[in-house]
């Protein structure tokens, strides 16, 4: 999904990584020394409290939108409004509208931004031609301009890692919630056990990962919980290789978990 908003998120992540690395000249610091990563994860980030209100919010009222297509001819993102952030930071998110442009469910194997299935034959679809759209973020707009993204989960790390190319394999534990719209009942199921050698030094570094998709969608809007479970931690390695996940589990949920937090991350100069 090479859309302007994803490009902005990638640019933001790359810039934060560069700033983080400038603070330390060593590239092999032990994993427990993680303060620079904490700074990266929280930079330009607001988190909600138990009342779904972003703490210290100072950006005024903003629209929450679900993007479903990109018009390359007009350099325009197509979206529907699904909620609002009020001036006091209160979040009201309740998708109800139909999504007008969808892709067939079976295309998920080519558009899965979690990149956790190695063999596309692992996917099993029910009603594979049903229209489908999944986003693990909500765009935040003011005056027809994107000012940031809103994610939902129980970890500031996971909600960033799983949206950042190159970081999706990290083993920080927790979950992110995705919003899915389908125009017919359908399903994605997959199970994959993968073993691989991550070493680039000649000394084997074998890991095993397990990935499960158990997604039986009802017509309309659905919530998917993607949980990172178990961690391979690699000490004395560059920060960008500090860990790998042991398991990803993708399941449907009927409501937002009680321990979930909204994370707003600004983009550009906003």
Identify the residue ranges that each predicted region occupies.
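Sec-dependent signal peptide cleavage junction
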Residues: 1-35, 269-270
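Acidic, serine/threonine-rich, charge-biased low-complexity segments
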Residues: 29-47, 87-93
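Short, ordered, surface-exposed loop/turn motifs in non-cytosolic proteins
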Residues: 41-76
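Glycine-centered loop-to-beta-strand initiation motif
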Residues: 62-64, 81-97
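Local beta-strand/beta-hairpin segments that build beta-sheet-rich folds
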Residues: 75-84, 147, 212
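Short, ordered beta-strand-loop transition motifs
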Residues: 85-86, 172, 256
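Long, low-complexity intrinsically disordered regions in eukaryotic proteins
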Residues: 96-198
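Extracytoplasmic cysteine-anchoring/structural motifs
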Residues: 176-270
């Amino acid at each position: 999904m090479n859309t302007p908003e994803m490009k902005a998120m990638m640019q933001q992540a790359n810039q934060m990584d560069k700033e983080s690395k400038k603070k330390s000249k060593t590239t092999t610091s032990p994993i427990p020394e993680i303060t620079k990563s904490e700074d990266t994860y929280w930079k330009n980030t607001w988190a909600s409290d138990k009342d779904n209100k972003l703490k210290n919010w100072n950006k005024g009222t903003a629209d929450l939108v679900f993007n479903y297509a990109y018009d390359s001819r007009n350099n325009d993102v197509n979206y529907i409004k699904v909620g609002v952030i009020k001036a006091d930071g209160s979040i009201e998110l309740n998708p109800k509208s139909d999504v007008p442009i969808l892709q067939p469910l079976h295309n998920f194997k080519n558009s899965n931004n979690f990149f956790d299935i190695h063999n596309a034959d692992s996917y099993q679809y029910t009603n594979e031609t049903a229209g489908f759209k999944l986003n693990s973020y909500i765009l935040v707009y003011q005056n027809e301009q994107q000012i940031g993204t809103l994610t939902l989960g129980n970890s500031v790390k996971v909600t960033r890692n799983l949206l950042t190319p190159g970081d999706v394999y990290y083993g920080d534990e927790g979950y992110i919630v995705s919003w899915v719209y389908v125009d017919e009942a359908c399903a994605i199921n997959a199970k994959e056990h993968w073993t691989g050698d991550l070493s680039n030094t000649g000394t084997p570094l074998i890991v095993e990962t397990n990935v499960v998709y158990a997604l039986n969608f009802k017509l309309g809007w659905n919530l998917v919980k993607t949980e990172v479970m178990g961690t391979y931690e690699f000490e004395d390695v560059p920060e960008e290789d500090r860990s790998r996940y042991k398991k990803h589990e993708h399941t449907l949920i009927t409501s937002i978990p009680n321990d979930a937090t909204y994370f707003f991350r600004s983009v550009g100069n906003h």
